[in-house]
Amino acid sequence: MFPKTSFTSLIVGVFLLYVLHTCWVMYGIVYTKPCEKRRAESCISPYLAAKPRLQLSVYTALRPNADGGHSLIHREEEFDVNTKFEKLVNVSLPKKTRKNGTLYAMVFLHQAGVSPWQDPHQVHLVTQLTTYMLPKPPEISLITGQDEPEKPDQQKQSSDSELDRPVSHWRSRLTLNVVSENFLFDREALPGDVHRYMRVYQSGKKMIYLPLLFVDELSNRVKDLMEINSSSTELPLTITYDSIALGKLRFWIHMQDAVYSLQQFGFTEKDADEIKGIFVDTNLYFLALTFFVAAFHLLFDFLAFKNDISFWKHKKSMVGMSSKAVLWRCFSTIVIFLYLLDEQTSLLVLVPAGIGSLIEVWKVKKAFKIHVIWRGLTPTFLFGKLDESEKRTEEYDTLAMKYLSYLLYPLCVGGAVYALVFVKYKSWYSWIINSLVNGVYAFGFLFMLPQLFVNYKLKSVAHLPWKAFMYKAFNTFIDDVFAFIITMPTSHRLACFRDDVVFLVYLYQRWLYPVDRSRVNEYGVSYDEKPKGKSHED
């Protein structure tokens, strides 16, 4: 009655609906309908339209309400909302702040020549100049035992075992924005995100809103934080100002609220920093491209995962498949997971890496025909036997690994020894994990070569999961785009491009050895993925 719909088609349809819905929501965020009514009382006019003389003042205070004790750190006498600037100032730290306390910045935009405390038309915002984080563990040379020279207070802090307690860190950047466009708001359609930043006063029959001042919290990155100790009497603060469009302001408010919500759910400052980097390190055009690229990356990831699981679930024989390559993928994913765990990476990255490691362990179990028998709490592992065709594949696989080991082992050992001598680490475990993961990133693609060698010897590629390969190939090319857009380690960026080379060789072999999936090969196996229906006699 209804046409048959595959699960993949359903997922693609849901994905397209999600992308369209997201585009509609984003349009609603960045677009604000201006007031088009003729009556003045129906609109809210901008204070900046009269071009008043303004002044920007920045104070520090121990409490956010600034009931006394505030100190002026910067004043911009002739402030122009359309002129951006960057000023470096030195801020004196009170004694309470140096003793693991907090410090606030109070930013005032007010009439020139008038104290902000006496200006009825001033706008101000309060933001923290400090945040709490765990101190970075010290790194030492594992050969000599020497570390970087520390100040006496830092040595005392380490000796008192305070590395497990959050300490106050200094935010060295303060980024300010003011909406420069003279936008006319409709009183009956005022966006809720802008409303909390808006101060309005009555002038006759007209409603006038004061300048929209905004403190960009997304620009506060972990890399800019400085640990505060009792000897830190002064610390630098870079005050940056630039005008901002209304659409970008609304978008930034939503993103800032999203990051704050994640922190309320238990995300640490470092976890939130991973998300901030997506928005701060790229402009809005790249950000839009990143969204679409990431959405398709997620789709192809899911489809590759689905087809890969389906392929291995029904896999009965390892004919034409490199078991060494399967074992290597399992090892490399576990090493990368342990490396991310050691580096205290965000849960957004850590959890998928952990799930991927479990799946690779399951593949190894299928590839080596391992059966686990539990006798009480003691497991017994039984390995299945290989038939003649699988033994032939295993011979080619072993031969390829033999040639590969002549190149791979000296490179990995040499890199590990070099790192041990010239690089500092937190512990021996950290050195082992870093050496292994560097080997995975730098030379991991070499372990894809045994499968190419097996394909060459068998003159066949029919045994490979080509649907999963194609989806992974799309993701590989998407990763190439990300390699230019997103900040990442150089080794990971090179890893994106090296996979392209190997996959192009796979494509060449597929063209060289065409596949008739309906034909039964010399091992009595057909690679037709569509099961044939039962025949019925009339």
From Swiss-Prot:
Pfam families: CLPTM1 (PF05602). Residues 1-9, 306-324, 424-428 are cytoplasmic. Residues 31-284, 342-402, 450-538 are extracellular. It catalyses: a 6-(alpha-D-glucosaminyl)-1-(1,2-diacyl-sn-glycero-3-phospho)-1D-myo-inositol(in) = a 6-(alpha-D-glucosaminyl)-1-(1,2-diacyl-sn-glycero-3-phospho)-1D-myo-inositol(out); 6-(alpha-D-glucosaminyl)-(1-octadecanoyl,2-(9Z)-octadecenoyl-sn-glycero-3-phospho)-1D-myo-inositol(in) = 6-(alpha-D-glucosaminyl)-(1-octadecanoyl,2-(9Z)-octadecenoyl-sn-glycero-3-phospho)-1D-myo-inositol(out); a 1,2-diacyl-sn-glycero-3-phospho-(1D-myo-inositol)(in) = a 1,2-diacyl-sn-glycero-3-phospho-(1D-myo-inositol)(out); a 1,2-diacyl-sn-glycero-3-phosphocholine(in) = a 1,2-diacyl-sn-glycero-3-phosphocholine(out). Glycans are attached at residues 90, 100, 229. It is a multi-pass membrane protein. Keywords: Apoptosis, Endoplasmic reticulum, Glycoprotein, Lipid transport, Membrane, Transmembrane, Transmembrane helix, Transport. The chain crosses the membrane at residues 10-30, 285-305, 325-341, 403-423, 429-449. Belongs to the CLPTM1 family. This is Lipid scramblase CLPTM1L. The gene is clptm1l.
